[in-house]
Design a protein with these regions (language model features):
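Short aromatic/basic micro-patch
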Residues: 26, 106, 173, 223-224
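N-terminal nucleotide-binding beta1-loop-alpha1 segment
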Residues: 1-18
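Conserved core of the sugar-phosphate nucleotidyltransferase
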Residues: 57, 67, 107-191, 198, ...
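Left-handed beta-helix
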Residues: 192-229
Length: 229
């Protein structure tokens, strides 16, 4: 089975302090993103596209990786879906695409395998986690059949939706052929004029693609927004 990983690593991460890219913050003596690269390299027949932007050369020179990992420069950071679009030409037709984040390096191989298994069934598969204080996170809104109906951002959530503790990690898996088909429908009709990957959920549902969620431990995907985290 072919797996095409897409790692989003273009941001600066101003709250990290300093001038280095966020994904190069130190974790156990190595750049954060290196831990993630080591994980994806354990998958046979996997290829990885790392989407870089801010100080892209520094990111590339700071990591150790095989020829199965390539770097793609996102010249303008126009949102997560725009970043994923940069990798579309590199995707194989018979593969599963897995979107990861360079600042969430602790996701486990076993967790990714569960996500990929779900995607192979034709689902858009999201990785979610339970957050006791979910302030600021997108809430997972499930249907009566327990499928994911939509993701509601905190600022848009109703009082009852804000009580939901299952939140979106951003990590997802989907057949590459489906990703190519659905992602052009994502528009930037929002205040920031950005293309949000979370819109893929609504688009998938409209196209009769089941959206499933796999819940993982929060430590795997909580991400890092400052050096303490």
């Amino acid at each position: 089975m072919n797996i095409d990983f897409i790692i989003l690593a273009a941001g600066k991460g101003t709250r990290m302090g300093g001038d280095s890219p966020k994904v190069l913050a130190d974790l156990a003596g190595r750049p954060m993103i290196q831990h993630l690269l080591d994980t994806v390299e354990t998958f046979p027949k996997a290829k990885t596209s790392v989407i870089v932007g801010y100080k892209s050369k520094e990111v590339q020179e700071s990591v150790i990786c095989s020829k199965n990992i390539s770097f793609i420069n996102q010249k303008n950071q126009l949102g997560t879906a725009h970043a994923v679009k940069q990798a579309l030409p590199a995707l194989r037709n018979n593969s599963v695409s897995v979107v990861l984040y360079g600042d969430a390096p602790l996701v486990q191989k076993s967790t990714l395998n569960k996500l990929i298994k779900s995607a192979l069934k034709g689902n858009l598969s999201l990785l979610t986690f339970i957050k006791e204080d979910p302030t600021g996170y997108g809430r997972i809104i499930r249907s009566s059949k327990n499928a994911v109906h939509k993701i509601t951002e905190h600022k848009d959530a109703s009082t009852s939706e804000k009580e939901i503790k299952e939140v979106n990690s951003g990590i997802l898996a989907i057949k590459s052929s489906l990703l190519r088909e659905l992602i052009p429908s994502i528009k930037n009709n929002n205040a920031a004029k950005e293309y949000y990957l979370t819109d893929l959920v609504e688009i998938a549902n409209k196209n009769s693609v089941s959206v499933k969620a796999t819940i993982c431990d929060s430590y795997e995907v909580g991400g890092a927004n400052d050096r303490q985290e």
